[in-house]
């Protein structure tokens, strides 16, 4: 059963990373930030490696989101290894713990000097944690999925 919780956590992490990215894009639209944390980390990594991706800004944005979703997948799986159905408070606390690692460890280690955006980043991580917890519970509540041959009509409420 533990492996199912880990897989659900990984799935929930992907879902939550997308929601978190959307929250950050809304903050950008509102003029609160210039770039998302994954974009800055990707810029720094590409600069250190001397890599300028073909495709320009769009390619850098894509790589930043792919890496961000991988981190979300990993973080969700780690939570699933600890608990199968985390409550919302647990999820938010987990997201804030990840934010502390990001804010106090990762960004300073990469010599990223923030001139704003800490509150946006903290809220985004809290949202991530809440969504991971919600998605893990909802995924666990779904009926069992199984292969369904195409010659058998599927009558389901699907949305």
What positions do the PLM features span?
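Short amphipathic, positively biased membrane-proximal segments
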Residues: 1-159
């Amino acid at each position: 059963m533990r492996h199912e919780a880990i897989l659900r956590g990984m799935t929930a992490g992907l879902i939550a990373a997308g929601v978190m990215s959307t929250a950050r894009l809304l903050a950008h639209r509102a003029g609160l930030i210039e770039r998302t944390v994954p974009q800055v980390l990707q810029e720094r990594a590409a600069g250190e490696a001397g890599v300028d991706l073909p495709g320009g800004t769009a390619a850098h944005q894509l790589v930043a989101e792919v890496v961000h979703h991988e981190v979300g997948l990993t973080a969700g799986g780690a939570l699933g290894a600890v608990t199968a159905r985390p409550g919302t408070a647990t999820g938010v606390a987990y997201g804030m713990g990840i934010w502390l690692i990001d804010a106090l460890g990762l960004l300073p280690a990469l010599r990223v000097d923030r001139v704003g955006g800490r509150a946006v980043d903290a809220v985004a991580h809290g949202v991530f944690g809440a969504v991971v917890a919600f998605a893990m519970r909802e995924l666990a509540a779904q009926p069992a999925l199984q292969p369904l041959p195409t010659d058998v009509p599927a009558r389901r409420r699907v949305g």
